[in-house]
């Protein structure tokens, strides 16, 4: 029980820090109109404004965090087994990515600044999880299992491998003057999702990547069949990569 309370306390602190860091950057983004692709941003779009304003950022982080806590943390907590530190770490990181997903959905652009916030949360969380008992309050000896050095090496290696693969898919077609099938923003996204998934194992990393492409492919096929997307058209892929990662994490603890 103390482990669950301590985990939720950590989630609350990290999510709050995420929100306060996102808010000023969000306001700057919604006002920026001077350089591409921001000059094409529909600044009056209700969903985009909701994602990038102070209040909308709070709702995104808190709601996303609450949903992900239920999907990822509670099933294992109810079994009575100690959760690994990578499990509660998933919640604030994925919650921090929700505003970036909303932006990508509307304008097909993953803002580097919003991604960097989630990356900073991931890095901080990995360090805290690695320290484990050293940072736990006195008297709490049933906290989540700390990460080992091998877990961290697998996370960094897995993230690097997937990033290189996605970056190649984005850059190589441009050498022949063709439009890339995947953007560099999606590759940058896996700098965050890759290590997060790899913390749970190589199978979770591969499952998350597969499900992301599967979800994105299903959406693209549906849009093609409905006539809302042309054969050479493009869709926002970031939200589906995030959905695939969340699904893989949920399946890894079910």
Q: Whereabouts are the PLM-identified features?
A:
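A membrane-topology feature that recognizes alpha-helical transmembrane segments
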Residues: 1-254
């Amino acid at each position: 029980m103390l482990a669950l309370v301590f985990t939720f306390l950590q989630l609350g602190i990290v999510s709050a820090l995420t929100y306060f860091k996102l808010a000023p950057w969000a306001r700057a983004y919604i006002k920026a109109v001077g350089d591409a692709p921001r000059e094409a941003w529909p600044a009056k779009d209700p969903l985009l404004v909701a994602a990038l304003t102070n209040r909308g950022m709070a709702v995104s982080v808190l709601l996303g965090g609450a949903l992900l806590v239920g999907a990822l943390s509670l099933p294992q907590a109810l079994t009575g087994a100690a959760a690994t530190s990578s499990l509660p770490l998933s919640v604030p990181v994925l919650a921090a990515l929700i505003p970036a997903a909303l932006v990508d959905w509307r304008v097909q652009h993953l803002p580097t600044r919003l991604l960097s916030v989630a990356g900073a949360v991931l890095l901080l969380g990995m360090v805290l999880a690695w320290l484990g008992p050293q940072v736990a309050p006195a008297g709490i000896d049933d906290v989540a299992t700390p990460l080992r050095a091998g877990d961290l090496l697998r996370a960094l290696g897995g993230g690097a491998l997937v990033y290189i693969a996605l970056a190649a898919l984005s850059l190589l077609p441009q050498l022949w003057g063709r439009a890339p099938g995947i953007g560099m923003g999606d590759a940058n996204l896996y700098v965050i999702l890759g290590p997060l998934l790899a913390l749970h194992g190589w199978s979770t990393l591969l499952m998350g990547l597969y499900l992301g492409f599967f979800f994105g492919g299903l959406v693209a096929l549906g849009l093609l069949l409905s006539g809302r997307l042309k054969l050479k058209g493009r869709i926002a892929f970031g939200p589906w990569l995030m959905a695939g990662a969340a699904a893989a994490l949920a399946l890894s603890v079910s």
